[in-house]
């Protein structure tokens, strides 16, 4: 039997590819022969001929499919496609997302509905992997993958001699054949080359904007892009865009990792070839030849948190039976609570785990299976190219924290990366690329806006203010700026009210019409004050802007409670004003129709009962019109 299927992944950060490759390798263990393909290379005309097709994709922006998938998605949206186009095709969809976003897995949901509408038959439920889960996306990925395999085995039964019990102990082949020059007799000097997808910006300013003794270190970063011409076209950006920064691992941890695995820094990797090109792609973000040192410093995400598959694969490379048993337990269904306590809560990285299993003997080629590449980190740009055409500004929080159990002190990878430049002035190249976000100013500067950006969430709104300042200074009529309300939040007025002079100057100049700052630790009697309290105090003004003047409402900042609380405050404002309008209408009707009191009272009760549905419909309309926009992380 020809046991084939096609797995299509659509990725921007690399996560979808990683998940799709793991799924492909798992299917091979069950005698299924998947064809793995990047959606960029997929011929859309093949889709109606697929017997079984599996999509793995994330959601980007405000509910859009990833950029590489847009040509295929636009093709699928053609209205003239017959309703039976995929009559012979079964499909499965796994979405990777973050439930802190209102558009959680929208791309997967839309694709699922569209494939059904043109005749496709779903193999199983849509998978919705959530990065906010205690176990991250792994929880749903593992669960959904097993359901998928069970469904596929009803279509492609196992051969009679197949022993399913062997799968548990079976080691997958490594992804790559790797050629290494371990001798380097000629002492070749291999210079690390930044991947071709990135511009080489130069660090120009790295300035702390919180007071020195304050617990939070927030930095104003300026990157010089005046000489960025690597991609044949000059680098360009707009207000609201996102800069992706490719960081490096700390030198101390790099040397520790190399010593831990018995490698040598000057070994040279000359070639990396996929063993099975049907299920493995060549590594991206990697230019060869490369030394072991640069591979570990610039490619492997050794400071990242291991996923479940890492523990499963590592169990094959320990010689100590007790260590092996522990790793097997961590990778089992029964061991997930213990794994969460050991790994996710303590934020262990790959080095931490490897040090705790000293009997490891890892074949070098399996490192690419065990440790993923460093992913570029996104930062909202906090400048406007109209005012700063040769620089990009970032507002970066140096992320340091202690873990809940062992109280280990941690610093995020990109935080360490930017911090390292303080003492390393000779190596100030920062690899970046720019991506458009879903947050844009209205087309007309006269349309009013409401901006809510506590902490480093203010970055995108600083870029908005700079753009408004440019138009005010370069306009024939200085009075054409619409209202702009800015709600900023921080902990202390004297410690972390960054960009204070700039924001207050913008208020004086009329760039913004209202500035409300909530200091969560400066409240009277120890009471905390948050931005949503100021928003609710401005209920009438916000309603006027949203309802009567077609204004825009933006939220930017850390995911978690803040975006949810601010959204709830907006919903409360919408509800109270809709009720107020409804009551006013009923009162007018009562005055004009004194003989119909009973009917009016009944209508009033019905409206009050349906108010939540009315509010939700109103809010959904704001989202559809892209007048309610969130940028959270």
Curated annotation (Swiss-Prot):
Binding site for FAD: 377-380, 412-415, 633
Domain Flavodoxin-like positions: 5-149
Entry-linked Gene3D superfamilies: 3.40.50.360, NADPH-cytochrome p450 Reductase, Chain A, domain 3, Nucleotide-binding domain of ferredoxin-NADP reductase (FNR) module, Translation factors
One GO molecular-function entry: NADPH-hemoprotein reductase activity
Enzyme Commission code(s) on record: 1.18.1.-
Cellular component GO terms held in the UniProt record: cytoplasm; cytosol
One example of a Gene Ontology biological process annotation: iron-sulfur cluster assembly
Cofactor(s) the record lists: FAD; FMN
Region ranges (Disordered): 580-610
Reactions listed under catalytic activity: 2 oxidized [2Fe-2S]-[protein] + NADPH = 2 reduced [2Fe-2S]-[protein] + NADP(+) + H(+)
Claim: Mitochondrion is one of the keywords in the record: no
Annotated NADP(+) binding sites: 456, 520-521, 528-532, 565
Localization in the cell: Cytoplasm
Compositional bias of kind Low complexity: 581-604
Domain annotation FAD-binding FR-type: ranges: 196-442
Keywords, ordered alphabetically: Cytoplasm, FAD, Flavoprotein, FMN, NADP, Oxidoreductase
Principal subcellular localisation of the protein: cytoplasm
Positions of FMN binding: 11-16, 58-61, 131
Its biological purpose: NADPH-dependent reductase which is a central component of the cytosolic iron-sulfur (Fe-S) protein assembly (CIA) machinery. Transfers electrons from NADPH via its FAD and FMN prosthetic groups to the [2Fe-2S] cluster of the anamorsin/DRE2 homolog, another key component of the CIA machinery. In turn, this reduced cluster provides electrons for assembly of cytosolic iron-sulfur cluster proteins.
Family under the similarity heading: Belongs to the NADPH-dependent diflavin oxidoreductase NDOR1 family. In the N-terminal section; belongs to the flavodoxin family.
Name used for this protein in its record: NADPH-dependent diflavin oxidoreductase 1
Organism ancestry: Eukaryota, Amoebozoa, Evosea, Eumycetozoa, Dictyostelia
